[in-house]
Amino acid sequence: MTEVKIKRLYTGDADFASQLDRLLAWSESEDTDIHQRVTEIIGCIRRDGDAALVELTARFDHFVVDTAAALELPRDVLEAAWQALPAEQAKALREAAERIRAYAERQKLDSWDYREADGTLLGQKITPLDRVGLYVPGGKAAYPSSVLMNAVPAKVAGVPELIMAVPAPRGELNALVLAAAYISGVDRVFRIGGAQAVAALAYGTETVPRVDKIVGPGNIYVATAKKLVFGQVGIDMVAGPSEILVISDGRTDPDWIAMDLFSQAEHDEDAQAILISPDAAHLEAVQASIERLLPGMERAEVIRTSLERRGGMILVDDLEQAAAVANRIAPEHLELSVESPEVLVESIRNAGAIFMGRYTAEALGDYCAGPNHVLPTSGTARFSSPLGVYDFQKRSSLIYCSPDGADQLGRTASLLAWGEGLGAHARSAEYRIRHH
């Protein structure tokens, strides 16, 4: 087994900042060819609707149907998939869904208002989105957890109609994905994928209804399409490769740390796994664990490439410095594998999800802990948050003026409007002023 060459950094090095920048750098292939093809696909769907959808589904998914209506999956197929699940799988899926739902319930925003002395009422009205599109990657390697994480918060928010798009290569669908759609309350399912599915959801066809927002992960074509339709519809986020950052005080079993790093590195070659510790001997022990455990992994080659290309081990002087480096990285997943995580977490400002303590494996959050696994990547945790109920609700401002309120506010508004040279604004306010 050849050595796994993982980049080593030390905060004491003069060029540490630039070394860290190089380690974190990831430029999504701004492939003009892909951009062009996706633009063409979106144009086809906008122009030809159902006919284009049927043709593109046959071309890209090798799934041939006579009409677009045949792309929709009857609701009883979802129920049958759920009923046919082995009891243990059904129990695990239900438990995960219930935990995600319980967490999401606490995120709900409520409308509020307050009244001023003159009777004027000001407030905020919370309304769920009318219709949301959920994209789910298809084929055999499907992700039922992704269905739960996207669908359950939408339903908790009160979204009346949830439309799922899932590609069916050669007509094949994953039963677990359909079962997850059933128990999380998905309303309609279309067997469509790629940029053509995103375009159909964004603009609508004769058969596929137009949605207000599109959520869910996908390949580079799906991500590019989501970017291009943003503005026509809302999107959740443009996700980069998966990331994990582990801060260890040196007292966690090195095998545990190695496997936690593997858990993200196995996603794909661009995934990033980084370990930070003030204990140099611990970094060596984890390196040894990596080399011992890697040959037994199912996705050993992907993990090796990911660790050698984008992995890192960072030696720091103390845990406070570790927190400062973590804030600079702003990771998607952050594990605090330390004695007192509740103390260290106070220093963390930028992270998608924070896993506190040695026993809290990031994988638990991926599947069933409760918090959402759709998280900001590529440093966007500096200004973004995990997917949640609030992503499926919108806020409207409420203003009600009593006659007295209109009199008072009208005088202020009139002065400001004339100052801006907007006479109609000023007069509109003045008409409601009481002339005593």
Swiss-Prot record:
Its cofactor is Zn(2+). SUPFAM superfamilies: ALDH-like. It comes from the Bacteria. Its EC number is 1.1.1.23. GO terms for molecular function: histidinol dehydrogenase activity; NAD binding; zinc ion binding. The active site is at 332 (proton acceptor), 333 (proton acceptor). Zn(2+) binds at residues 264, 267, 366, 425. Binds 1 zinc ion per subunit. Pathway: Amino-acid biosynthesis; L-histidine biosynthesis; L-histidine from 5-phospho-alpha-D-ribose 1-diphosphate: step 9/9. It holds the Pfam family Histidinol_dh. Substrate binds at residues 242, 264, 267, 333, 366, 420, 425. InterPro entries: Ald_DH/histidinol_DH, Histidinol_DH_CS, Histidinol_DH_monofunct, Hstdl_DH. NAD(+) binds at residues 135, 196, 219. Keywords: Amino-acid biosynthesis, Histidine biosynthesis, Metal-binding, NAD, Oxidoreductase, Zinc. GO terms for cellular component: cytosol. It catalyses: L-histidinol + 2 NAD(+) + H2O = L-histidine + 2 NADH + 3 H(+). Belongs to the histidinol dehydrogenase family. NCBIfam families: hisD. PANTHER family: HISTIDINE BIOSYNTHESIS TRIFUNCTIONAL PROTEIN, HISTIDINOL DEHYDROGENASE HDH. Catalyzes the sequential NAD-dependent oxidations of L-histidinol to L-histidinaldehyde and then to L-histidine. This is Histidinol dehydrogenase. It comes from Methylococcus capsulatus (strain ATCC 33009 / NCIMB 11132 / Bath). The gene is hisD.
